[in-house]
């Protein structure tokens, strides 16, 4: 939002636009003489003009949550109404930028103040007015054309990855009386003028949108394309869709942040919005340090990942109230890129801190607390946030589809999944990637527990798999069965040892170990394994399940004959094959390429069939 354009206390002539501070309690300020103010209206509090938002009105008293440190505000200080809700600026310049929770650009503030701290009451516009952008109007638009909300009327090449489509704000329409010719313009220049019912309106490349309002769409569509993360355990066993909602709950040190960062690095999304909401500051600085160095290959060209990423940083040492705003800022930015027809992923790390901010404000308002002191409306607030995800048909012309996928990390205290935030989140989201402390302690990463996690998008994706990877669905079912059987056998093994098991059960145990150690486990810090394309995932799983089927068949068919094949015989004769199976993951998709990896896996399958044939003979 352009805070420099908001009214200032010293410029006001009439005292009627002022209220006065009546009481201060942490981030919550009460003000009197506020008759005529609206809910969620922005106000400037005190002589240092702190940004705040009205969250309750009673008579002429307003309760305000202030997004900055309130020390020094005293009773009788002026409170200025702005007449606007908390809004964000949407236009060229968002990609690659880093904002705080109320969309103030941190790099601009730092260059202005020459300090590592944000001063109070700072006035900076969210999108720079000095940068010139190369604007190209759409070919089919000319003076006299009719245009409605959501129509694309121009294109700005923001960078080599993102074509920024300039859209008419959703609530406007009219006849074009002027459209700017191709050329360089800054974000305050008029590029379009419309006339509707005799009233003329001018538009620049920036539109302002209130964060608590959902951006309108033509219709919501069912999701049908997977969100590929590059993590085998997630893509194979618990897939999410583009336009889906996912929760990653886990205790500290389980690797939530690593999973959400690898999602933003390697997923098949066009745009990434990463919201660090109340997490440690050094995690955000790690993102800022790593992302500019990370590259991705697009059409043979190497590009920086930062070009498709926007960061909203609201770390744990920033004021609490702005945490609540940062989630809404992030989702509004995501919806804006969705309306252009892009597939957007939004990472919220972590929604627990957001809920704690709600709890603190609710406590200061003396509202009735519910479970664990959280407000009674916690579930409704979480739902209203997650429901803004989805695949949609965008408003306006030309026709286009976009999607917003939300991945919310949840940090339950002590890893307790019965915590109110976790249980409320699980009631809303469709995919649950549960992280396990025990797996993390065994250094098994990503530490997704394959027994408690689930995805409700399996059915929605069947059509996609049938079309592109026909053999995949039965493989996944089989792998899950093997892992479940292994869990059931684990108790027996602890009591009586492995030796007393049936031969087929021994095979189940060994293949489950193979799947766990060499398929589900993945080292995110190695070049060959930090990202696993889906064809490699399917190829690896297919060979492991083929080995399981052949071994079981060999044992079952020779069980009655004299020369019985047992698991120990198979292991003795197939040392080489087992070694090759467990080293399938070392194939580097970047160096070796798809064709070579597929050929190697097919060769391994052939070697396996020959080895079993010679064993049975």
UniProtKB/Swiss-Prot annotation:
ATP hydrolysis occurs at the interface between the nucleotide-binding domains of subunits A and B. ATP hydrolysis triggers a conformational change in the subunits D and F, which induces a shift of subunit d. The c-ring is subsequently rotated and results in a continuous proton translocation across the membrane. The V-ATPase is inhibited by bafilomycin A. InterPro entries: ATP-synt_VA_C, ATP-synth_a_Xtn, ATP_synth_asu-like_sf, ATPase_a/bsu_AS, ATPase_F1/V1/A1_a/bsu_N, ATPase_F1/V1/A1_a/bsu_N_sf, ATPase_F1/V1/A1_a/bsu_nucl-bd, ATPase_F1/V1_b/a_C. It is a peripheral membrane protein. ATP binds at residues 250-257. It comes from the Eukaryota. Pfam families: ATP-synt_ab (PF00006), ATP-synt_ab_N (PF02874), ATP-synt_ab_Xtn (PF16886), ATP-synt_VA_C (PF22919). One of its GO terms (cellular component) is lysosome. The modification Phosphoserine is found at residue 384. GO terms for molecular function: ATP binding; ATP hydrolysis activity; proton-transporting ATPase activity, rotational mechanism. It is found in: Cytoplasm; Cytoplasm, Cytosol; Cytoplasmic vesicle, Secretory vesicle; Cytoplasmic vesicle, Clathrin-coated vesicle membrane. Its EC number is 7.1.2.2. This is V-type proton ATPase catalytic subunit A. It comes from Bos taurus (Bovine). The gene is ATP6V1A.
């Amino acid at each position: 939002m352009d805070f420099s354009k908001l009214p200032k206390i010293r410029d006001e002539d009439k005292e009627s636009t002022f209220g006065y501070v009546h009481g201060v309690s942490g981030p919550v300020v009460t003000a009197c003489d506020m008759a005529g103010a609206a809910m969620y209206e922005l106000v400037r509090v005190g002589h240092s003009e702190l940004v705040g938002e009205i969250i309750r009105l009673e008579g002429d008293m307003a309760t305000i949550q202030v997004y900055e440190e309130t020390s020094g505000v005293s009773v009788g200080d002026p409170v200025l109404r702005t007449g606007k809700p908390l809004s964000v600026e949407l236009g060229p310049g968002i990609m690659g930028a880093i904002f705080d929770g109320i969309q103030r650009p941190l790099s601009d503030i730092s260059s202005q103040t020459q300090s590592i701290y944000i001063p109070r009451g700072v006035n900076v516009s969210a999108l720079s007015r000095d940068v010139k952008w190369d604007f190209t109007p759409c070919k089919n638009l000319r003076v006299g054309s009719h245009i409605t909300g959501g129509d694309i009327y121009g294109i700005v090449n923001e960078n080599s990855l993102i074509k920024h489509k300039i859209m008419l704000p959703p609530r406007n329409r009219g006849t074009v009386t002027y459209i700017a010719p191709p050329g360089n313009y800054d974000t305050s220049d008029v590029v379009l003028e419309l006339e509707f019912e005799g009233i003329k309106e001018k538009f620049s490349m920036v539109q302002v949108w209130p964060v608590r309002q959902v951006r309108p769409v033509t219709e919501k569509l069912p999701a049908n394309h997977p969100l590929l993360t590059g993590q085998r355990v997630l893509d194979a066993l618990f897939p999410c869709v583009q336009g889906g909602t996912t929760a990653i709950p886990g205790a500290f040190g389980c690797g939530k942040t690593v999973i959400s960062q690898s999602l933003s690095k390697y997923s098949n999304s066009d745009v990434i919005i990463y919201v660090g909401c109340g997490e440690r500051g050094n995690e955000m600085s790690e993102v800022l340090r790593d992302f500019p160095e990370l590259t991705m290959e697009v059409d043979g060209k190497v590009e920086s990942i930062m070009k498709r990423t926007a960061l909203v940083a609201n770390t744990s040492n920033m004021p609490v109230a702005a945490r609540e705003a940062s989630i809404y800022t992030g989702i509004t930015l995501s919806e804006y890129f969705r309306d252009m027809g892009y597939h957007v992923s939004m990472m919220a790390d972590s929604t627990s801190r957001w809920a704690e901010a709600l709890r603190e404000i609710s406590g200061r308002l003396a509202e009735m607390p519910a479970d664990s002191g959280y407000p009674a409306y916690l579930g409704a607030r979480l739902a209203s946030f997650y429901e803004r995800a989805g695949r949609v048909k965008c408003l306006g012309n030309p026709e286009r589809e976009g999607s917003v996928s939300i991945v919310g990390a949840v940090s339950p205290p002590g890893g307790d999944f019965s915590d109110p935030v976790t249980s409320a989140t699980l009631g809303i989201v469709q995919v649950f990637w549960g992280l396990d402390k025990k797996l993390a302690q065994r250094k098994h990463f990503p530490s997704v527990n394959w027994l408690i996690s689930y995805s409700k998008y399996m059915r929605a994706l069947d059509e996609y798999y049938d079309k592109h990877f026909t053999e995949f669905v039965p493989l996944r079912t089989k792998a899950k069965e093997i892992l479940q059987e292994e869990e059931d056998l684990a108790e027996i093994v602890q009591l009586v040892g492995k030796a007393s098991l049936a031969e087929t059960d021994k095979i189940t145990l060994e293949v489950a170990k193979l799947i766990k150690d060499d398929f589900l486990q993945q080292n995110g810090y190695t070049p060959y394994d930090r990202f696993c394309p889906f064809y490699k995932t399917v190829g690896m799983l297919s060979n492991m399940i083929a080995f399981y089927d052949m071994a079981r068949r060999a044992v079952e068919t020779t069980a009655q004959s004299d020369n019985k094949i047992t698991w120990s015989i198979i292991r003795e004769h197939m040392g080489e094959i087992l070694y090759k199976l467990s080293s399938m993951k070392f194939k580097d998709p970047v160096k070796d390429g798809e064709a070579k990896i597929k050929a190697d896996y097919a060769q391994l399958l052939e070697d396996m069939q020959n080895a079993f044939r010679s064993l049975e003979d």
